[in-house]
Amino acid sequence: MTAKEYINRRAALVGQAMKINKKFFPRCVKAKLRQIARLENEYRGADYETRKNELYKEWFN
């Protein structure tokens, strides 16, 4: 995966997550955050669980 592909895919996932009303659909938002964490794990080699938890804290606090 190239840097441009990563940026485009991540931007699309973040955009989709931002459009979801997290008050009524928190599980859907968490699913998108898991996809973002999985993508970052694949591209950057970041630890999936750690990054997933960081994203949860960032989006839900």
What would you call each of these model-derived segments?
Residues 1-8, 21:
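Short, charge/polar-rich alpha-helical segments
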Residues 12-60:
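Acidic, low-complexity, intrinsically disordered interaction modules
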